[in-house]
Amino acid sequence: SSAASDVYKRQIVLLVVLFPANIFAQERRDKEQTYVLENPYEVNKITPLQGKKIKNVVLMIGDGMSLMHVYSAWTANRGKLFLDNCQAVGLSKTYCANKLITDSGAGGTAIATGQKTNYHSVGVDVEGRPLKSLVDFAVGKDKSAGIAVTCRLWDATPADFCCHNKDRDAEAEIVADYVNSNVDYVFGGGAKLFENREDGRDLFKELRDKGFQTPRSWDELVKIKSGKVFAGPYPV
């Protein structure tokens, strides 16, 4: 019948469309998918000093890094990583107060303050109230505290330790909080939001007025041996 013929034609067309995909999928399965690090780097084993009080604590955050990322690197480097020398490792449950999937704002706030907060929030609780971070607790115990990042300073992860805002996208507002934070040393990018601002503020000048040195290049930074430092050499 005509109807049966139409169905048959549709089936033929469907097979023509799908069959090549099955072939390609088989080719992908048959092809070996491997990565080989030809020159793995050496990892020195560091033995912790026994009986001595720890002076410095470094918190390393691989933003978005999961156990699988670490395991992949460990496997590629023949079962050795400098991370193996870390004496303490922590895990964060990656959900925020109002969403199942977090972002760097809420996720970083949990690490920095020990409290869950809303999606996109930076250093504030679910009501928008500022939270004390590890930086504040360190200074409260007469310790110095600093942050050094490979991103812009208004990015949520570094901002979680020094700034307070309900919206991580309020970048100009966020960087202004560094002026009144308790941090002693800062290194990161994003200098363009510290000067030539729409509100007319020069945040580098305000930081200098508070006793910070504000080197704008790597050469200037390495010459500084003491004192409070706010280094923003990268304008991006």
Each language-model region and where it sits:
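Short, small-residue-biased leader/transition segments that mark boundaries at the very start
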Residues: S1-Y8
